[in-house]
């Protein structure tokens, strides 16, 4: 509450880096980035896996806290903060409802892993990671190593959302807009060819200075 009621944070984050619900759906965003734009999506409620089918997990949307959804940096902060509390609640529920017995159900994990390594076939895995849906595809051909393994991390699904978020915004707002989707750049390692007529480079110090200057202007 102390963070969410801070006037300076509201001034810097409200109506900045807006991602509409329509754009969020068109760009196939996932996780808190999608939910902050009003998209009611969460694999734990939509396609429950593991124990989630027995737990009370529902997608957190900004209007549950603020009574409205703007899809801005502030809403993305709200969703992430509320999801911290939700995670604590899930842990408490798991502890209170966990059945008695051994922690690991499979007594011979090494044997199980050996069988899995020699498996044949293909499968997919989908989980709701902190940044959204993480998708894995694996193809096994009876050898110890997978024949094919492809991963689509949640940050990769959210990168395109920067386009509408950043369009028309001030340079001073770039750091908070980029950070608002909590990007894991190592999860999005790809090759890209970029062609441009000219370019300029802003250092970390330049971005920090511009951000501080804008905050001070708003406080005047």
Task: Label every model-predicted segment.
Residues 1-220:
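Active-site bordering "gate/hinge" segments
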């Amino acid at each position: 509450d102390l963070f969410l009621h801070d006037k300076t944070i509201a001034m810097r984050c409200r109506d900045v880096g807006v991602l509409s619900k329509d754009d969020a759906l068109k760009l196939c965003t996932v996780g808190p980035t999608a939910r902050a734009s009003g998209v009611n999506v969460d694999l734990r409620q939509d396609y429950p896996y593991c124990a989630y089918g027995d737990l009370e997990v529902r997608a957190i949307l900004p209007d549950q806290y603020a009574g409205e959804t703007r899809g801005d940096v502030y809403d993305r902060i709200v969703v992430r903060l509320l999801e911290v509390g939700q995670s604590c609640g899930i842990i408490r529920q798991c502890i209170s409802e966990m059945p008695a017995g051994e922690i690991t159900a499979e007594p011979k994990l090494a044997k199980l892993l050996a069988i899995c390594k020699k498996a044949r076939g293909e499968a997919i895995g989908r989980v709701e990671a902190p940044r959204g849906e993480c998708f894995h595809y694996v193809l096994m051909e009876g050898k110890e190593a997978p024949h094919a393994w492809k991963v689509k991390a949640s940050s990769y699904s959210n990168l395109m959302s920067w386009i509408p978020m950043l369009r028309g915004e001030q340079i001073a707002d770039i750091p908070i807009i980029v950070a608002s989707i909590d990007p894991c750049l190592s999860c999005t390692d790809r090759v890209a060819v970029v062609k441009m007529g000219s370019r300029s480079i802003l250092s970390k110090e330049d971005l920090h200075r511009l951000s501080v200057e804008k905050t001070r202007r708003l406080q005047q």
